[in-house]
């Protein structure tokens, strides 16, 4: 009887599984290629989501066998994942209007903004997080927090756990950097950290939100943290109204929320009070968990790779000696000179990306990607971790090698930086009259070749008329000389800019063949270009107008530039920055997060060494395949201001004052 029951149970499970396979096949039928057929997909049991199977049962789909595009499941919804770099650029390109952000698990204010609102938010928050002025202002705050940690009782006890002590240290540091030094700031930040560090119990309550109405321990804790997260509204309001000092005695502490408020105040449009109270742009998963993950993984790898630790110490020592600095006096410019440390962080992000997938996009209309039909409403994602560990992209991808990242130290792989919000506003405030003088000649460029003769006659007549107006134009140019110079750097009218770029790009394509990503590159239009058509001599004047777009920090992607890169170079750069996202929606806090981690590493590793601290039950935690849940011992023999060249520690002389 017992065996019969087991047999019936097995039969029922098999029938259910086969029925599930049939339903999945029917659900994924539209994802079809005209030759290859239906798209590859993960196994049916992943219809319940990857979370329980990967974490609880340690089961993972064999993604390498699925190709460059495949579908996997989040409950009943198929999510198409793409690993081809060109397809990723196509979907996640900021100019793509068919693929909008979609994330139903997070009803964030980020996703209800559209059009010019997104550009305005992006401009202000980008400047606050990435301007050199902002980073220089916030760096002393980071240094003071690290020194406080070194002098604390926890640090002096020598043995620290990354799960407890290092995490608490990072919470205090990040709350001070982002929100300020008040207790409200710390409690608000910690509550947001818990929001993005959810457990299975949180996930279960997300699936069944009515459970929160039951007076349980979890629901009470949830409501308490929710109220603490609401403190952000108060902190943002204080920052918003505190930009203008009421008296000379007022002191505004350096924090990112105050810098954002100041940047908004100095911006040409700025943010309203309700907009600056939106927490999603400042307190999100990447800004909160990103630096923590980077620090823990880097400390773990440096313990495992003593030769890399020695190279970092050597670079710190060389930069300090070169610039006459020490651990107390180094500044932002000194850190920017540490290229090997930069490469080490990039390699950490490649091997252990803070987030394994990019934020999904949703198709507004049906499309084809890599030949497969993608129906309207399909969610598309990018498996970052799988791409960054793909042998076709990196040789020996599972090995930690910072040297492989040094190729990206070439300036062409780096986005040009901006100094302050005034630079963007200044470049966009040029004279509209001076731009119009350049733009009036554009219609003659955009005419078809069949009408060139008629246009030449018309242009001659126009030139005669223009000669009569030369004196007026010269007077305008003379009076607005400085404005015209600014005009060569920025378009004032975005509508005219778009119409010119769209029209002129097609003309340039017809004349000059190129495999460059940016069709408007200057080297194809200079005097050495082989343009033999006499009717197109006016194109030699175009570079001055194109220079407007090239030097504009917004239109020329001071945020996200692929200008003058080949397709291969562009793909290399996409892979390099993939841990932080791609396109206009990539993580804005990348440079700030890296500055925080660099400062921590420079201060700690210029004075201390790290060793494993193993208990009898801790050996399995030191497996390099696991997350760095290890304990770290700060060597008590090292005293500041020593600089460690290798594990054989010795003192070095202080820099001369």
Curated annotation (Swiss-Prot):
Name of the top EC class for this enzyme: oxidoreductase
Keywords: Heme, Iron, Membrane, Metal-binding, Monooxygenase, Oxidoreductase, Transmembrane, Transmembrane helix
Membrane topology of the entry: Single-pass membrane protein
Principal subcellular localization: membrane
Needed co-factor(s): heme
SUPFAM superfamilies assigned: Cytochrome P450
Homology family: Belongs to the cytochrome P450 family.
Protein name, as recorded: Probable cytochrome P450 556A1
Upper lineage: Eukaryota, Amoebozoa, Evosea, Eumycetozoa, Dictyostelia
């Amino acid at each position: 009887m017992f065996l019969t029951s087991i047999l019936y149970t097995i039969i029922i499970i098999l029938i259910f599984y086969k029925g599930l396979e049939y339903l999945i096949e029917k659900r994924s039928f539209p994802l079809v290629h005209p030759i290859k057929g239906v798209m590859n997909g993960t196994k049916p049991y992943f219809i319940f989501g990857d979370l329980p199977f990967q974490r609880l049962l340690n089961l993972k789909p064999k993604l390498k066998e699925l190709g460059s595009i495949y579908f996997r499941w989040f409950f009943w919804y198929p999510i198409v994942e793409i690993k081809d770099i060109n397809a990723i650029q196509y979907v996640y390109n900021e100019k793509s209007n068919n693929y909008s952000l979609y994330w139903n698990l997070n009803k964030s204010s980020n996703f209800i903004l559209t059009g010019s609102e997104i550009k305005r938010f992006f401009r202000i928050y980008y400047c606050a997080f990435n301007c050199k002025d902002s980073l220089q202002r916030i760096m002393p705050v980071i240094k003071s927090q690290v020194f406080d940690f070194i002098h604390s009782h926890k640090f002096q006890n020598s043995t620290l756990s990354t799960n407890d002590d290092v995490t608490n240290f990072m919470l205090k540091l990040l709350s001070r950097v982002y929100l300020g030094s008040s207790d409200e700031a710390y409690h608000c930040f910690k509550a947001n950290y818990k929001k993005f560090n959810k457990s299975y119990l949180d996930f279960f309550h997300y699936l069944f939100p009515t459970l929160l109405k039951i007076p349980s321990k979890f629901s009470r804790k949830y409501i308490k943290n929710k109220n603490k997260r609401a403190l952000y509204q108060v902190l943002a309001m204080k920052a918003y109204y505190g930009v203008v000092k009421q008296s000379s005695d007022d002191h505004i502490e350096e924090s990112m929320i105050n810098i954002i408020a100041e940047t908004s105040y100095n911006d040409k449009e700025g943010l309203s009070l309700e907009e600056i109270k939106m927490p999603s742009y400042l307190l999100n998963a990447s800004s909160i968990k990103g630096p923590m993950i980077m620090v823990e993984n880097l400390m773990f790898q440096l313990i495992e790779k003593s030769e890399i630790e020695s190279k970092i110490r050597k670079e710190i020592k060389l930069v300090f000696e070169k610039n006459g600095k020490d651990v107390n006096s180094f500044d932002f410019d000194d850190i920017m000179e540490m290229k090997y440390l930069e490469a080490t962080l990039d390699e950490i992000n490649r091997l252990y990306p803070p987030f394994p997938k990019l934020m999904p996009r949703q198709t507004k209309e049906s499309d084809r990607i890599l030949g497969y039909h993608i129906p309207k409403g399909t969610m598309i994602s990018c498996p970052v971790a799988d791409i960054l560990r793909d042998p076709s992209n990196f040789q020996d991808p599972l090995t930690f090698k910072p040297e492989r990242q040094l190729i990206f130290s070439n300036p062409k792989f780096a986005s040009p930086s901006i100094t302050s919000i005034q630079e963007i506003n200044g470049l966009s405030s040029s004279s509209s009259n001076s731009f119009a003088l350049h733009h009036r000649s554009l219609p003659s460029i955009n005419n078809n070749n069949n009408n060139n003769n008629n246009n030449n006659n018309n242009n001659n007549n126009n030139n005669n008329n223009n000669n009569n107006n030369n004196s007026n134009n010269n007077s305008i140019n003379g009076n607005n000389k400085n404005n015209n110079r600014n005009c060569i750097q920025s378009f004032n009218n975005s509508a005219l800019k778009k119409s010119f770029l769209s029209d002129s790009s097609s003309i340039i394509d017809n004349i000059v063949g190129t495999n460059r990503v940016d069709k408007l590159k200057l080297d194809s239009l200079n005097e050495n270009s082989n343009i033999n058509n006499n009717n197109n001599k006016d194109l030699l004047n175009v570079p001055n107008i194109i220079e407007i777009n090239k030097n504009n920090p917004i239109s020329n992607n001071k945020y996200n530039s692929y200008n003058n890169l080949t397709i291969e170079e562009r793909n290399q750069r996409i892979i390099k920055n993939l841990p932080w996202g791609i396109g206009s929606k990539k993580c804005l806090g990348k440079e700030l997060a890296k500055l925080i981690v660099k400062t921590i590493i420079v201060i700690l590793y210029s004075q201390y060494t790290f060793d494993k601290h193993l208990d009898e039950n801790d050996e399995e935690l030191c497996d390099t395949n696991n997350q760095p849940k290890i304990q770290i011992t700060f060597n008590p023999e090292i005293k500041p201001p020593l600089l460690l060249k290798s594990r054989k520690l010795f003192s070095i002389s202080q820099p001369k004052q």
